[in-house]
Every structure is written in structure tokens, then in C-alpha cells.
């Protein structure tokens, strides 16, 4: 797959909601192609998402920060 198109990644876990209004979902994805194939990373996703969905990532190096619980 060309780098211009992105890298497919499968959603394997939904971690939780984030963002000021809860409109962003943090998920763990397993990268399916490219040099990071098989790597599991955490990403933020806007819009509806379910376990098993395939996301196309523009790049696979950045990882979202862990959601911290409020006290």
C-alpha cells in the first residue's frame, strides 16, 4: 500500500471518551500493514466506532496520551 493512502488498522478495544464534550473516542488499534504491522497503539477517533472496525491511519508513529481519570 502506498504511503499516500494510509495504513489500515483494526479496532481491538474501546478505552473511553475524551474531549471537552466527549465527542472523541479513544481506542486501541492493531496495525495491519506497513512497517509497523502487528503493533498495537492507542488513537483518538471522532465519530462512531466499534470493535472490529478498520481505520485508515495517515501515519503509525504517533500515539494518543492515556486518558486520566478526574478526581
UniProtKB/Swiss-Prot annotation:
Coiled coil: none annotated. InterPro entries: NA-bd_OB-fold, Ribosomal_eS28, Ribosomal_eS28_CS. GO terms for molecular function: structural constituent of ribosome. GO terms for cellular component: cytosolic small ribosomal subunit. One of its GO terms (biological process) is ribosomal small subunit assembly. Pfam families: Ribosomal_S28e. Keywords: Ribonucleoprotein, Ribosomal protein. Belongs to the eukaryotic ribosomal protein eS28 family. Part of the 30S ribosomal subunit. NCBIfam families: PRK04007.1 (NF003080). This is Small ribosomal subunit protein eS28.
Amino acid at each position: 500500500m502506498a504511503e499516500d493512502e494510509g495504513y489500515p488498522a483494526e479496532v481491538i478495544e474501546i478505552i473511553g471518551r475524551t474531549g471537552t464534550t466527549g465527542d472523541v473516542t479513544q481506542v486501541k488499534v492493531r496495525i495491519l500493514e506497513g512497517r509497523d504491522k502487528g503493533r498495537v497503539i492507542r488513537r483518538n477517533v471522532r465519530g462512531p466506532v466499534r470493535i472490529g472496525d478498520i481505520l485508515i491511519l495517515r501515519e503509525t508513529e504517533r500515539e494518543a496520551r492515556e486518558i486520566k481519570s478526574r478526581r
